[in-house]
Amino acid sequence: MSKEKFERTKPHVNVGTIGHVDHGKTTLTAAICTVLSKVYGGTARDFASIDNAPEERERGITISTSHVEYDTPSRHYAHVDCPGHADYVKNMITGAAQMDGGILVVAATDGPMPQTREHILLGRQVGIPYIIVFMNKCDMVDDEELLELVEMEVRELLSEYDFPGDDLPVIQGSALGALNGEEQWEAKIVELAEALDSYIPEPERAVDMPFLMPIEDVFSIQGRGTVVTGRIERGILKVGDEVAIVGIKDTTTTTCTGVEMFRKLLDEGRAGENVGALLRGTKRDEVERGQVLAKPGSITPHTKFESEVYVLSKDEGGRHTPFFKGYRPQFYFRTTDVTGDISLPEGVEMVMPGDNIQMVVELISPIAMDEGLRFAIREGGRTVGAGVVAKIFA
């Protein structure tokens, strides 16, 4: 057993608990750690250590998050749990804790509540691809029909937000019962772990995705041409590859004739590496910071999209006053700011610091984007909001 623990050859999957306040998210997190450590080995974590979540700052936004880890025989999981509702909203929108799948906790005693709905909507907006339901506190409900009713309600709610409500796994259990070592409820935690293993597909690694590198800097080197530098976000760039330069101006294609890192020439650059790419026949003034270098056809430039946005509170260094329609801030995508116009949902006149809101944004110049891309909202270089592209219109 001890040998297996140190093998990091297992696929790594990021998950997290979501759901209404007091439905048992943190208790479930503790129960998973405790039961799986008993069954498969690993470290148990108690409720208190998870509930005292440390504060972190992600893009200037204060978020309290607990990170725990656990193993099943086939996978290693990193799991996030947040103490407060506001922390979930911030976490999901900033992508501070990207999730490959979410565990939606719904108390059988209450059924779906307002935050249940809000977390499902947020999950849809920010692109959590898979949701598994853990119906908690089932030991407090004697009526089998009531349990069925709650399950049906949760499935319908998920379907309403385009999750496959009829097909996704719903596990009826008791996190507290499992934490207290009651066998029938411990078995439900193992069932949940098995559902995570089978229902959430292995995430595609960044290196296997189509190549993309945000351009941070552009140099021209006498006699060699133009070099663009940046950190490769995904995929692999090989010498000789055809690449597209996307965003801000019309898309052009060129060939990468050299890749270098720390002044050494390489055959290729991979996701996560900071490299310089030499571009054939490209002039210094044809490329700029804020564009991306990408595999041709893999990403397109857009100006108009729907987004889910969190507006920083005054305490987080955000605005002190609300903003209204007609507000024109800068939207910071990857490496650059672009001015944009916003339109607010019907019936919303103003947005207060600390709110989260859906807004449609129209940028003055196009940016390479796909759904799920994160951005910051800035005024004069100061971050006042964070958002994610939910749906592209144009």
UniProtKB/Swiss-Prot annotation:
Annotated stretches, region: G3: 81-84
EC annotation from Swiss-Prot or TrEMBL: 3.6.5.3
One Pfam match: GTP_EFTU_D2
Enzyme class name: hydrolase
Binding positions (GTP): 19-26, 81-85, 136-139
Catalysed reaction equations from the record: GTP + H2O = GDP + phosphate + H(+)
Every tr-type G domain range: 10-204
Start and end residues of each stretch annotated as G5: 174-176
Cellular localization per UniProt: Cytoplasm
Region (G1), start-end ranges: 19-26
GO molecular function annotation: GTP binding; GTPase activity; guanosine tetraphosphate binding; translation elongation factor activity
Keywords of this entry: Cytoplasm, Elongation factor, GTP-binding, Hydrolase, Magnesium, Metal-binding, Nucleotide-binding, Protein biosynthesis
Region spans: G2: 60-64
UniProt keyword Transmembrane helix present: no
Major localization listed first in the record, in broad terms: cytoplasm
GO cellular component: cytosol
Region (G4): 136-139
Highest taxon above the source species: Bacteria
Family: Belongs to the TRAFAC class translation factor GTPase superfamily. Classic translation factor GTPase family. EF-Tu/EF-1A subfamily.
Function statement: GTP hydrolase that promotes the GTP-dependent binding of aminoacyl-tRNA to the A-site of ribosomes during protein biosynthesis.
Quaternary structure annotation from Swiss-Prot or TrEMBL: Monomer.
HAMAP family listed in its UniProt record: EF_Tu_B (MF_00118_B)
Protein name: Elongation factor Tu 1
